[in-house]
């Protein structure tokens, strides 16, 4: 286990692109490989795109999107067809020597904190054919439940999973449904800053 003090989570930047692409495409069958153009596209559409640094080196990353993203993933499309609001974890990937070191749980805590004041559910998918028991165990023990299944064009089967975010109900009722309420900036600002209409507390 790596000590928490040695890990830094930060927003991605363009200089990280080649590193994260290599990490993604050398992660085995649980993560689908993509090309550089598709990875670069995430820089434009992902509200949450953070990397974990250890001693100045990128050790992993997590990408999450919300429904307005222009993204053609069949799993993202499935969630858009079934839920009007959500934060979708597209992928969380670590280098081989940093797997099962606690970085995934740090990422999960961070994206959960991001999601629960913005959307009512957090969603993702896990491969069930071939079966990814590491991811299934992780998400099931974090309170995710299966919302559906589908077979991808490549023939692989996935479990589509979601987790209700109870804190969002408070945000919606206290701030978003009241025109006179002021929502603190940290609860709506993100790397794309797509919600400027909400009033800001400096």
Predicted regions and their residues:
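Conserved acetyl-CoA-binding loop-helix of GNAT-fold acetyltransferases
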Residues: 94, 100-113, 137, 141
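Conserved active-site alpha-helix within GNAT-family acetyltransferase domains
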Residues: 129-148
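A short helix-loop-beta-strand connector motif used in the catalytic cores of GNAT acetyltransferases and
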Residues: 41-51, 60-70, 88
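A short beta-loop-alpha structural element at the N-terminal edge
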Residues: 4-20
């Amino acid at each position: 286990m790596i000590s928490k003090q040695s890990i830094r989570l930060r927003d991605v930047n363009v200089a990280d692109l080649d590193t994260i692409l290599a990490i993604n495409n050398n992660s085995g069958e649980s993560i689908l490989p993509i090309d550089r153009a598709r990875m670069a596209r995430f820089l434009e559409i992902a509200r949450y795109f953070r990397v974990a640094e250890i001693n100045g080196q990128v050790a992993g990353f997590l990408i999450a999107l919300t429904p307005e993203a222009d993204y053609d993933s069949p799993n993202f499309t499935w969630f858009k067809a079934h839920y009007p609001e959500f934060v979708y974890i597209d992928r969380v990937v670590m280098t081989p020597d940093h797997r099962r070191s606690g970085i995934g749980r740090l990422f999960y805590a961070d994206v959960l904190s991001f999601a629960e004041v913005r959307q009512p559910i957090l969603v993702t998918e896990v491969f069930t054919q071939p079966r990814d028991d590491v991811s299934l165990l992780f998400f099931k023990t974090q309170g995710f439940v299966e919302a559906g299944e589908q077979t991808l064009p490549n023939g692989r089967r996935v479990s589509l999973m979601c987790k209700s975010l109870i804190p969002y109900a408070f945000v919606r009722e206290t701030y978003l449904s009241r025109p006179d309420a002021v929502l603190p900036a940290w609860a709506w600002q993100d790397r794309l800053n797509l919600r400027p209409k909400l009033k800001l507390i400096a």
